[in-house]
């Protein structure tokens, strides 16, 4: 995955897709004030922990281009949220869509406190996946649920 700023790559992340052999590589030259960012010119920013969760939310969202997206790639690299708010004054709301675990809950607490102090005009919304720990697992759950229903559907 490559994220660009002013037509230059500023954040590169490699990620494996085989669950039994977890692989992820980030590069030392990555700009963690930018992270992996997709700008659709929206006033609403969706923040995720992982790029795959970002893509899952895009798939689950009816019109994914209504939002900007930021994957911080770790609960420790949340500074990028504030950098994007500082550099893009049209953003009016932040939708926190991180993992539903202790680290994700703590991240939301930290970010909300800091956002309220530094950007009091920005609305904050926190939502966790209704089922499963993260948004990619939730997408898989929804697809499997639909396929199970489709498998029992009889077409006349």
Spell out what each predicted region is.
Residues 1-87:
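Phosphate-handling DNA/RNA-contact segment within nucleic-acid enzymes
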Residues 42-43, 59-156:
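TOPRIM fold recognition
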